[in-house]
Amino acid sequence: MRCFRLSRHFIVYLFSLCAILLLAGCVQSRGGFVSKNHVVLAEQNPNTHFEQEVMIVRLSQVLLVGKMSNEERASLHFERGVLYDSLGLWGLARYDLTQALALQPKMASVYNYLGLYLLLEEDYDGALDAFNTVFELDSGYDYTHLNRGLNFYYVGRYHLAQQDFLQFYQADKKDPYRVLWLYLNEQKLKPQEAQTNLVERAKGLSEDFWGTHIVQYYLGHISVEELQQRASEFAENSQQYAEILTETYFYLAKQKLNVGLVDEAAALFKLAMANQVYNFVEYRFAAFELMKLKPVQTEDEKEEKSAVTKAIVF
């Protein structure tokens, strides 16, 4: 079984690598993370998730044979669901989280996860209900302000998103990711103030976060080539490098998308997913952004086909 698991992961990695190399030609760059002949990816180790896989087996055994209270069983379902989520097995994660909720209907953390899954399925009303329930159960659940803010952001209710993103930022002003989402929202809500606010908020950021360097890039203080160099220096191991690249490609993609470079943004979103950091916000919403871009790309393809048809007829 061990040999089979290793070979399967290796084959998936090779397939993904080939697909990503094809994307490089879609992104025009003078250098840095992506060029026509070069794509920066983290090294993939087939054993990266071995500990999570072992823990899932152990939790499954306990759930099958263990005698416990509903509260204990709900906790185990939640733990296994979070592990499944970290492996990108979102269907299995959702099943476990639903089981946990059936046993313990007042688990705020479960509603937070389920709300996120509903958001990623574009069930915005269902997601909003779930996030509101989190606050009813636990008013101090900080990260739900981010998730509910994202829900508002993606339906264009930027004034409501601003309230949640601002509250999320005020809870930790040293966190650059809170600053980045405020900036992205303000580009839609009040673009004339977004850059000025980013400059001001950047002053209080911690250098302990990789995202601080992304903010410096957004401000124009460093080039994409310098950003790449800092990324390789910042990462202490291949897993951290994968996380850094996931974040970086996502925010580079958002920058491209905001200036109308849809094809380049799509390629960068795919690269954000290539490092397989499934439980990062940036991975989840890279997949979400790609899903939202499909109708746009489909309409473009229809127009091209229509133009070709007219050319043939006339």
UniProtKB/Swiss-Prot annotation:
Lipidation feature positions (S-diacylglycerol cysteine): 26
Lipidation sites (N-palmitoyl cysteine): 26
Keyword Transmembrane: no
Localization (cell): Cell membrane
Repeat (TPR) residue spans along the chain: 74-107, 108-141, 246-279
InterPro entries: Lipoprotein_NlpI, TPR-like_helical_dom_sf, TPR_rpt, Ycf3
PANTHER family found in the cross-reference section: TETRATRICOPEPTIDE REPEAT PROTEIN 6 (PTHR44858), UDP-N-ACETYLGLUCOSAMINE--PEPTIDE N-ACETYLGLUCOSAMINYLTRANSFERASE SPINDLY-RELATED (PTHR44858:SF1)
Name of the protein in its database record: Lipoprotein NlpI homolog
Native source organism of the sequence: Haemophilus influenzae (strain ATCC 51907 / DSM 11121 / KW20 / Rd)
